[in-house]
């Protein structure tokens, strides 16, 4: 399987796996941006991609940024559809107490390539009953 990548900024760093067997490809900032506490910013990566057929790219936060600085992704995971050809950008938010400077070349997120399936939609009058029923939002308890 191949991920085709086009640099649209000469300073862009191509995504790569940090270690053999890693699920996520590191994504890098191509700009310097200050994110103030409780502020959200759309960070450019300087790349466009062509995903393999029948896949999506899931953009996920980096645990180290979240733990150390409260920096995470606002919509996580973000979905990149197979047909999207625009620049990959990452919607970040600062949940920390201090401003955080995203530097050029900094690892800002990771992208996991996953297979997808589309389903046929069938409208019905009734759904099959289950033991769970309509229980949701805490209905299974915490212990």
Swiss-Prot record:
GO terms for molecular function: dUTP diphosphatase activity; magnesium ion binding. It comes from the Bacteria. Its cofactor is Mg(2+). Substrate binds at residues 62-64, 75, 79-81, 89. Keywords: Hydrolase, Magnesium, Metal-binding, Nucleotide metabolism. It is an enzyme of class 3 (hydrolase). Pathway: Pyrimidine metabolism; dUMP biosynthesis; dUMP from dCTP (dUTP route): step 2/2. It catalyses: dUTP + H2O = dUMP + diphosphate + H(+). InterPro entries: dUTPase, dUTPase-like, dUTPase-like_sf, dUTPase_trimeric. Pfam families: dUTPase. Its EC number is 3.6.1.23. One of its GO terms (biological process) is dUTP catabolic process. This enzyme is involved in nucleotide metabolism: it produces dUMP, the immediate precursor of thymidine nucleotides and it decreases the intracellular concentration of dUTP so that uracil cannot be incorporated into DNA. Belongs to the dUTPase family. This is Deoxyuridine 5'-triphosphate nucleotidohydrolase. It comes from Clostridium kluyveri (strain ATCC 8527 / DSM 555 / NBRC 12016 / NCIMB 10680 / K1). The lineage of its organism: Bacteria, Bacillati, Bacillota, Clostridia, Eubacteriales.
